[in-house]
């Protein structure tokens, strides 16, 4: 678990700039509020495909954290495999050192 990333995620949540869970992430992406989306290493294949589609559709960068859902639970008090940050500063800090996941928009016929 990366304690630096956990700290950033926790601060983001306390600032009210974090969407937790698939439904909230999709809503924030659709509204244009999401600056970046982050997934855990143990997200299901179905959820991974769904979040890739959402990020491709709304042109939001997607990153994979070196964290599990249990690590996320430790930092947030809520078990989640996908989060979105609605603040550019927090998103940039959390994405530092991570490579965005490449998404081919043609894969989804968007």
Residue map of PLM features:
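Conserved catalytic alpha/beta core of Sir2/sirtuin-type deacylases, generalized to analogous enzyme cores
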Residues: 1-3, 15, 103-106
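Short, ordered loop/turn segments at secondary-structure junctions
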Residues: 23, 42-43, 67-70, 88
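N-terminal first-folded block
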Residues: 4-39
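Mid-chain, well-packed structural core segment of small domains
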Residues: 54-83
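Solvent-exposed alpha-helical segments within well-ordered globular domains of core cellular machineries
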Residues: 7, 23, 27-30, 49-53, ...
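C-terminal structural segments of small proteins and small subunits
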Residues: 73-110
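N-terminal positively charged helical leader segments and presequences
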Residues: 30, 34-52, 59-61
